[in-house]
Amino acid sequence: MAAKDVKFGNDARVKMLRGVNVLADAVKVTLGPKGRNVVLDKSFGAPVITKDGVSVAREIELEDKFENMGAQMVKEVASKANDSAGDGTTTATVLAQSIVNEGLKAVAAGMNPMDLKRGIDKAVVAAVEELKKLSVPCSDPKAIAQVGTISANSDETVGKLIAQAMDKVGKEGVITVEEGSGLQDELDVVEGMQFDRGYLSPYFVNKPESGTVELEHPFILLADKKISNIREMLPILESVAKAGKPLLIIAEDVEGEALATLVVNNMRGIVKVTAVKAPGFGDRRKAMLQDIAVLTAGTVISEEIGLELEKATLEDMGQAKRVVITKDATTIIDGVGNKSAINSRVAQINQQRDEATSDYDREKLQERVAKLAGGVAVIKVGAATEVEMKEKKARVEDALHATRAAVEEGVVAGGGVALIRVANAIRNLCGDNEDQNVGIKVARRAMEAPLRQIMANAGEEPSVIANNVRSGEGNTGYNAATEKYGNMIELGILDPTKVTRSALQYAASIAGLMITTECMVTELPKEDKPDLGNAGAGGNMGGMM
């Protein structure tokens, strides 16, 4: 076991504080409408330019191990805020830095660290309650666009795109961000249910100019099995041919003579038919087939529940207004499924998502909800260079997370105003003793830090603006972009309540732990000893002669 280096008391806290300040100072230059960029060097490729707090925090490793421990703990604040709300990482870092700096001053003055922490925790619990009272629901597209604009560093086109995407696919819909091919940002919406399986044979194509299959008002056969024997299919093919409608077969696989016969029938025009593989694998495939069945009012033909393909009738078929199939995707548009059945299926999947333990499972379940409930929107980010593309894509993703958080828990006045109002609302809060009261003051003072930092980045005098905002009422604040006072909600300067709440809670949690630290232990750096192996070998050879 390697030898350890141990530091106690003030020595440990001074080192830790230095690390906290190095990381926080690098992150906080990005805060606000006039925040600056940070350039990150990469071991390969071009440097990355970013205004995203968590991206900056993740890059920082300090040489001194004690300082690095302080930096890593603040990095945890940014990461937690990012994981919880998807934004607010810089605000969380600024709050944590302020609480740690003020808290350690109080500890140096002889306050009890445990009581300080209890006071800070008490203040944060009260502040979160006040924050909820200030929160305003965010549901109309204009407010959603404003939240997206603020989070994307005042980029209005991004805010509008996100609002359009949410309007198209609904609150439960999946919105993804991809790199586009042009200079302009684009929104691509896939309505209906789409899954990544294409036609099994190019001979099914009926729109050769686009290389797609388009079926109008088709019957949809869902089978949880491989189909290789055409005899099983004959009764249903005859029924579909008599009905004069096209048929889409979604099965585990269609192969051999079954596929060949379907292709021949399709080419001769006897029955218009297309076959695709079912999406997913194993249990997920069964679940997705059931989703399609609910969407199209069909039944999954599965031997597990005693249904056989030979005995299937038209009543077992699903139906949709239109189906479009490319070589690698199938889209079912306007399934005839019962709305209440679809809603109960969505509720069931939502419950599974809430109970899921892995992020991957949660993501897949959310995708299934989106496909049933609305659709999928893709925001394609346009930029002139790869460096700009990466920076812009990160901003759009942040803005998307912020708007989701806003829809979930509502919005409060932005620009650091909400935290100042909250700090004022809890001014009469008292602890059990004087040390706890100091902890409450530390937390209240920290709540001014985001506004002060926004002003410092804008080149204003933080103390003057903070005093003016503090003496104001309601949502009155200072717009650093236009350098004017006004009602932040009316000006469209909004912060999602969830983002502000998460930033405050995580900052206080980790800063409280740092204030109560009395000892730090790290490994001593190893000294690389010169390799004397070759010299020894030469000496031995000399002895042998």
From Swiss-Prot:
<dbReference type="GO" id="GO:0005524">
    <property type="term" value="F:ATP binding"/>
</dbReference>
<keyword id="KW-0143">Chaperone</keyword>
<feature type="binding site">
    <location>
        <position position="415"/>
    </location>
    <ligand>
        <name>ATP</name>
    </ligand>
</feature>
<dbReference type="InterPro" id="IPR027409">
    <property type="entry name" value="GroEL-like_apical_dom_sf"/>
</dbReference>
<keyword id="KW-0547">Nucleotide-binding</keyword>
<feature type="binding site">
    <location>
        <begin position="30"/>
        <end position="33"/>
    </location>
    <ligand>
        <name>ATP</name>
    </ligand>
</feature>
<dbReference type="GO" id="GO:0005737">
    <property type="term" value="C:cytoplasm"/>
</dbReference>
<dbReference type="InterPro" id="IPR027413">
    <property type="entry name" value="GROEL-like_equatorial_sf"/>
</dbReference>
<comment type="subunit">
    <text>Forms a cylinder of 14 subunits composed of two heptameric rings stacked back-to-back. Interacts with the co-chaperonin GroES.</text>
</comment>
<feature type="binding site">
    <location>
        <position position="495"/>
    </location>
    <ligand>
        <name>ATP</name>
    </ligand>
</feature>
<dbReference type="InterPro" id="IPR002423">
    <property type="entry name" value="Cpn60/GroEL/TCP-1"/>
</dbReference>
<dbReference type="GO" id="GO:0140662">
    <property type="term" value="F:ATP-dependent protein folding chaperone"/>
</dbReference>
<feature type="binding site">
    <location>
        <begin position="479"/>
        <end position="481"/>
    </location>
    <ligand>
        <name>ATP</name>
    </ligand>
</feature>
<feature type="compositionally biased region" description="Gly residues">
    <location>
        <begin position="535"/>
        <end position="545"/>
    </location>
</feature>
<keyword id="KW-0963">Cytoplasm</keyword>
<comment type="function">
    <text>Together with its co-chaperonin GroES, plays an essential role in assisting protein folding. The GroEL-GroES system forms a nano-cage that allows encapsulation of the non-native substrate proteins and provides a physical environment optimized to promote and accelerate protein folding.</text>
</comment>
<keyword id="KW-0413">Isomerase</keyword>
<feature type="region of interest" description="Disordered">
    <location>
        <begin position="526"/>
        <end position="545"/>
    </location>
</feature>
<feature type="binding site">
    <location>
        <position position="51"/>
    </location>
    <ligand>
        <name>ATP</name>
    </ligand>
</feature>
<dbReference type="InterPro" id="IPR018370">
    <property type="entry name" value="Chaperonin_Cpn60_CS"/>
</dbReference>
<dbReference type="Pfam" id="PF00118">
    <property type="entry name" value="Cpn60_TCP1"/>
</dbReference>
<keyword id="KW-0067">ATP-binding</keyword>
<comment type="similarity">
    <text>Belongs to the chaperonin (HSP60) family.</text>
</comment>
<protein>
    <recommendedName>
        <fullName>Chaperonin GroEL</fullName>
        <ecNumber>5.6.1.7</ecNumber>
    </recommendedName>
</protein>
<dbReference type="GO" id="GO:0051082">
    <property type="term" value="F:unfolded protein binding"/>
</dbReference>
<dbReference type="InterPro" id="IPR001844">
    <property type="entry name" value="Cpn60/GroEL"/>
</dbReference>
<dbReference type="InterPro" id="IPR027410">
    <property type="entry name" value="TCP-1-like_intermed_sf"/>
</dbReference>
<dbReference type="GO" id="GO:0042026">
    <property type="term" value="P:protein refolding"/>
</dbReference>
<dbReference type="GO" id="GO:0016853">
    <property type="term" value="F:isomerase activity"/>
</dbReference>
<feature type="binding site">
    <location>
        <begin position="87"/>
        <end position="91"/>
    </location>
    <ligand>
        <name>ATP</name>
    </ligand>
</feature>
